[in-house]
Amino acid sequence: GFEVTFGGGRIDRVDIMEDQNKVYVKVIDYKTGNTSFDLVYLYHGLQLQLMIYLDGALRVEQKKYPDKEIIPAGVFYYNIKDPMIQEKIDADVEAVSAGLMKELKMNGLVQADPELVYRMDSSLGSIPVAFNKDGSFRKNSSVADRTQFAVLGRYVRTKIEKIRSSILEGDAEVSPYELGKKNACTYCPYMTVCGFDRRL
């Protein structure tokens, strides 16, 4: 894996896997918090970063390999904090190791191609995918096919353009999002000066 810079942005890690006529691109964003990839947040424009990074990485790789098909392999958040595992003092090494692997598992979206999934992680220990006995993806697997990745990419580009236009038009309305129990004010450094009453 390597770091990639594009158009003013910096991607923490990009892994590529090259075939005869294809290049698969995987993007990893390191986080110190407990960030989870969520399509609802992406839809509302609150979690565009990974897909923006993927779009940038795909463009960079297309320039490097103009004669090859560039395919998204996956986008992931990886928690870089040292995990704390609660085990009894006499717990066996395998139980502790399994607990660590569970805590270190990346979350995100994976290309729905079983062969590619096994090439990325033959143990399936680090990516959010599991298989049924018949070889199909389990219901809780976080997968998208190539068409779905393309649709998400187009949606994010459109969303960015709408946000950009809104900013250029001077839209500075104080209207923080609220999804479930989360809202934009929770970690906002400007909450004491913006004038928004969170009790409304």
Which residues fall in each region the model found?
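Structural signature of nuclease core domains in nucleic-acid processing machines
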Residues: 1-200
